[in-house]
C-alpha cells in the first residue's frame, strides 16, 4: 500500500519509521512528508532513499494510509482532505480525540469499533495510553470509581527542542534556546502544556477526558497532575485507583494485569525490581509495579506505570492501529513490500 508519513522528521516520525520496519508493515510506496525547509531533500528508510514531499504533493499521490504526527493545526486542515481522497488517517495530535464520531483507539482495548467507513482515527495522548492499558482489564472485572494520577513525563514528549535544552544544561550551557519556561536539568516542572481556567493544564485534562472515552465509561472519575522531569526514556505514573466495590486482592490484580496483552508486571521490590523509564526505553510494553493496598481507603490500590512515550505512547500504537486496519480487511495488503 501507499503510506504517507506526515511529520517524518520529527521525534515521533523518526520512531514511526523504525517501528514500521521492525513490525514489517506492508508498504509498497513510502511517502515522507515534512516542513517546507525539508521538502525536496531525501530521507533514507528501509534501505532506500525517498524524496520528502509537501502536503499537496502527498495528497495528489492518494496514499492508502496516512500516519500524521505534525501537530493539531496541520491535522485539522489536512486530515479531512486525505480522508475525502479515500485515505485512512491515523492522527497523533489532540485535534480529533474528543470529537464525537472520531474513534480514540488503543488497539488492545477498543480496536473493534473501527470500520471501513472510519477514515480519521485518533491516537490518544501518550500518558493516557499507558494508563488505560492498566485500567481497562481491572475495570472490566472490578468496576473503577475514580483514578488519581501524577505523571513524571519525559522531555521527549515535548520534542527535540526540549531534549536539546536538557542536554545543553547538562553540559553547563544555559543561554541556549529554551523549550521550557525554566531549566529542566536537576528540576521538576509541574507544567505540561498550557494552563486552563480551572487550574489544570491541557495535559491533565487530556487524561481526564480521554480515559473516559477509551474505557467507554463516563462514570469513571479522573484527576491528574502532570510533571515534566529531566528524563528521556519514557513517562512514569503514580496511580491511585478506587473501585466501586471491594478492591481485588493484590494477587488477583497481578494476575489480571499479567494476562493483558502488552502489559508486563514487574513487581518484586524485595529484589529491587520495579518499572523505570531507563529500562522501558525502546520497548513497546507498558510496565506496572509497586502494586499495593492504599492505607486510607479500603477500596483503593496504588500502582506505578512506566512506558516509552515515543513508542507505545505514540508511534507503536499508531502502527498497531494500521495493522488492525489491514487484519480487518479495511486496508489491502500488497504482495511485495517496499525497500
Task: Please place each PLM-identified region on the residue numbering.
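N-terminal Rossmann-like NAD(P) cofactor-binding subdomain of oxidoreductases
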Residues: 1-184, 219-221, 255, 268, ...
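Glycine-rich beta-alpha junction loops
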Residues: 36-38, 126-127, 151-158, 188-195, ...
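A glycine-rich, Thr/Ser-enriched phosphate-binding loop motif common to dinucleotide/cofactor-binding enzymes
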Residues: 120-130, 199-208, 313-317
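A broad structural signal for alpha-helix termini and local helix breaks/kinks
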Residues: 142, 215-216, 243, 261
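Oxyanion-binding "anion nests"
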Residues: 187-232, 238
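C-terminal active-site/capping subdomain that shapes the small-molecule cofactor and substrate pocket
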Residues: 222-339
